[in-house]
Amino acid sequence: MKYHSIAAVLLTTSLACIGPVAEAATSVLFIGNSFTYGHGSAVRYYRADTVRDLNREGQGGVPALFKSFTQQVGLDYDVAIETRGGTGIDWHVLNRLSVITQQPWDIVVAHGFSTLDAKKPGNPEQLVQTALQLAQALQAKNPKADLRLEATFPRADETYGPKGAWYGKTIGDMAKDVRAGYDLAAKSSPVIKGVIPVGEAWVRAMDAGVADSNSLDGTDAGKLNLWTYDNYHASVAGYYLKGLVVFGALTLQDPRSLGGNECSGFELGLSVPQIKALEQVAYEQLKLSYPIKPAPLENLALESPQRCLPAR
């Protein structure tokens, strides 16, 4: 009897010490290609230890930026990446479905090839079909599946290069055409909860004078080049803007709340004015279609940028 009483006391004490059970992190899987893993920039292997690369290629990319942003505002996300360069959603459905459906993800972010269809630029048919297939597979694993499609950024080579599919049109035209394709795909299944406006944010940055609109003829003084050396993939600034838009779309947090001293931008070589300008662009784009609550900017820290805290 005495033994049982002591055991009961010890059990009660131990439970009290444990305290409330911490809520599980929100799981997010990013499915994409070089536009997600950050080809052509320092973003590709940035903080790769903070995300799970399901293909074991050691890449951080935009998912690692997203993870960093969430940590800085006190949010807990378990972030994973599954990518293959030069592919669309069709490749992942055909070759990686068993990997993708290994767990019931809370949120999945996916995008296809940058021209909608590598063989038929501007044609959304394959995107629509394979987005539906992906949605069905995710729902079979998780009845509450939440798939977000990402309307990718426009390409300078496809718009200004004479062999480009959008040659003779504007960079905004390509962004609009790509967005229209993703809007069609989003209508294919109720599992698809929305389209993240990455391409439109890029065009907004150009219209606002933050970024240059044509990297093929050089970069205007005082403006950012969102493309890297091949005029196809993004620069650090381009991927950074994409990361901010994804961050706001998934968390509904004002990107400006990260402040001009945001540590990942600092580590990747962006200046405080550049970081603030890109955050403002992301906010202006997101507020058009998301219930983003404006951050009290006057309360942001004014300290000089510092390195990000170690991964946890």
Model-derived regions, located:
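Conserved catalytic region of serine esterases and O-acyltransferases that act on ester linkages
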Residues: 216-312
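Conserved SGNH/GDSL esterase-like catalytic core that processes O-acyl groups on lipids
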Residues: 38-129
